[in-house]
């Protein structure tokens, strides 16, 4: 039975990945979930799998080398999937220190622990081991022209403390691959949405606020463009890179769903209006009048767009969820009697 060590598995993408893996592999794998349980981590995301015999939760900080080394000493870890990170740009602007500590130093701890556990006396590594570092398209900076895309060869140009910390962690992983031939991959993904996302992020924030008749804040002119990917498609991509990706390679994961932020808000409002039944008091609250333009974020990148050609051609991955369908599924979670 292959054992996966998943960091940050109580967070948004990590918990969706764990659900995806158990749905696909059931009892063929074992997952050890390591999470510090910061504000963005929630074990309720994993309530329905917590009693599985092939699932273990360990509350630990990835910056705690002793705790991480102990996990490797007590378990034969085959794969590491490293999600754990501070990820909110606004928070990084106010407090960059924690982003550098968690995203950079935490990644270094994970790399050193895996290297120590997997390295053989001759400097090679045990067969079948792999470390997958999950990163973001924000490390590439901003695109100005329509038709431009981020490729794996695009130079890094981070503009926020968050993206700088992720770029630094990417470079650490790359340095271990280059220096030690450490068995790893890096994935850089576009914006995710779907179940279990923390409500400070754009899509859940807009859905929650609209249903409560609260202001819908829009940075600047609202025309900043992001490429959106349903989170289960991201989980599928990570699994496929683990299984089929060439060692030492980086793979971009994107959905070719480029939308302006203001377009996202209008799509959500239209979807909620369509979904809410007549007589539901929330239907009257959902209105374009709630849209409020606010001062733009410092260093706000104008446009992100991923070219996923490499992962499609080499690994066979493709996104299955159309944006409109994914938004509808996400809105349904928040309008149901037991919203996630």
Give residue spans per PLM region.
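Conserved small/polar residues in nucleotide/adenosyl-binding loops
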Residues: 334-340
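Glycine/proline-rich active-site loop of Rossmann-fold NAD(P)-dependent oxidoreductases
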Residues: 167, 185, 192-205, 212-214, ...
């Amino acid at each position: 039975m292959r054992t996966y060590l998943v960091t940050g598995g109580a967070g948004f993408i990590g918990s969706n990945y764990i659900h995806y893996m158990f749905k696909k592999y059931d009892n063929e794998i074992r997952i050890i979930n390591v999470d510090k349980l910061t504000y963005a981590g929630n074990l309720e995301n994993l309530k329905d799998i917590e009693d599985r015999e092939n699932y273990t939760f360990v509350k630990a900080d990835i910056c705690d080398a002793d705790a991480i080394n102990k996990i490797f000493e007590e378990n034969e870890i085959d794969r590491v999937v490293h999600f754990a990170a501070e990820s909110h740009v606004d928070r990084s602007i106010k407090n960059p220190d924690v982003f550098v500590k968690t995203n950079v130093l935490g990644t270094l701890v994970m790399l050193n622990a895996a290297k120590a556990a997997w390295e053989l006396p001759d400097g090679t590594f045990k067969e079948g081991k792999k470390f997958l570092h999950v990163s973001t398209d924000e490390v590439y900076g901003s695109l100005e022209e329509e038709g431009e895309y981020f490729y794996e060869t695009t130079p890094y140009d981070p503009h926020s403390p968050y993206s700088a910390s992720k770029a630094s962690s990417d470079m650490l992983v790359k340095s271990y691959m280059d220096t030690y031939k450490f068995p790893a991959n890096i994935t850089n993904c576009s914006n995710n949405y779907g179940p279990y996302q923390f409500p400070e992020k754009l899509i859940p924030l807009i859905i929650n606020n609209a249903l409560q008749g609260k202001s819908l804040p829009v940075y600047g002119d609202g025309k900043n463009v992001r490429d959106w990917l349903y989170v289960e498609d991201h989980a599928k991509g990570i699994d496929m890179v683990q299984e089929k990706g060439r060692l030492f390679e980086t793979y971009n994961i994107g959905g070719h769903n480029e939308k302006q932020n203001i377009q996202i808000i209008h799509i959500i409002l239209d979807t909620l209006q369509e979904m809410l039944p007549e007589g539901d008091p929330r239907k009257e609250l959902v209105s374009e009048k709630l849209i409020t333009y606010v001062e733009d974020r410092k260093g706000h990148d104008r446009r992100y767009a991923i070219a996923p050609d490499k992962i499609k051609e080499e690994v066979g991955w493709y996104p299955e969820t159309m944006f409109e369908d994914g938004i509808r599924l996400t809105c349904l979670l928040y309008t149901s009697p037991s919203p996630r």
